[in-house]
């Protein structure tokens, strides 16, 4: 569910949103839906922290066991994307963090006073190649959705939780685009957006 749809559902249901929680790039404890101007679908700050105090960021292997395996002709592309999603997410995270910091970002469980991202792939969806070829206006886009948490390597304390989805290949494209590549590009965008979150901490 996209953030705007989620907010609309809350209003219809008569549920309240904590003051200051919607559309804010906050770094204090609380849940932000979305975080920023749709920059990240959902961020929960569990504990305030200072990014500069940490030696770097490590990314544990993503849990892909909960992601649908794909169907029909696209099953092979989904499996290929699942096999490469760690690298794409890491690439995006490096891009996001390097835009403001020289902190090292590397795969692994992390050690010392570093941040560790432990993520789960909720969905890698190939979208519709036919719709990408002929319809346009965002139709048929492939997408990736991830959820996870950021913890301290040395203490195991959870500092932040996130859920985010990105799309790639929307609109008309020649041949509809390769769905595997588009799913991986979506995962890269998720990583990049998350990497930029640390800038406000």
Predicted regions and their residues:
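Bacterial N-terminal signal peptides that target proteins for export
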Residues: 1-9
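Bacterial N-terminal signal peptides
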Residues: 8-16
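Surface-exposed short loop/turn segments
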Residues: 23-33, 100-157, 168-177
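A structural "domain/chain start" motif
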Residues: 20-91, 196-201
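Generic domain-boundary/flexible-linker signal
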Residues: 68-70, 130, 159
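Short secondary-structure boundary motifs at beta->alpha junctions and helix caps
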Residues: 74-80, 139, 145, 151-200
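Sec-exported extracytoplasmic/periplasmic mature domains
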Residues: 90, 94-102, 126, 167, ...
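Short, small-residue-rich loop/turn micro-motifs
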Residues: 61-66, 123, 162-168
């Amino acid at each position: 569910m996209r953030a705007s749809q989620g907010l609309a559902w809350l209003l219809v249901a008569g549920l309240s949103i904590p003051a200051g929680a919607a559309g804010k790039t906050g770094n204090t404890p609380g849940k932000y839906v979305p975080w920023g101007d749709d920059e990240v679908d959902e961020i929960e700050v569990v504990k305030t922290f200072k990014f500069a105090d940490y030696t770097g960021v490590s990314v544990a292997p993503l849990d892909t066991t909960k992601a649908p395996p794909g169907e029909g002709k696209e099953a092979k592309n989904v499996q290929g994307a699942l096999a490469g999603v760690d690298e794409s997410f890491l690439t995006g995270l490096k891009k996001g963090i390097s835009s403001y910091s020289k902190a090292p970002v590397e795969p692994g469980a992390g050690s010392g006073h570093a941040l560790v991202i432990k993520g789960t792939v909720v969905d890698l969806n190939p979208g519709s190649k036919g719709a990408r070829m002929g319809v346009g206006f965002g139709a048929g886009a492939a997408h990736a959705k991830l959820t996870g948490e950021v913890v301290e390597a040395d203490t195991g304390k959870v500092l932040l939780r996130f859920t985010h989805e990105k799309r790639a290949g929307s609109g008309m494209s020649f041949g509809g685009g390769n769905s595997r590549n588009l799913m991986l590009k979506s995962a890269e965008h998720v990583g990049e957006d998350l990497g930029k979150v640390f800038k406000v901490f």
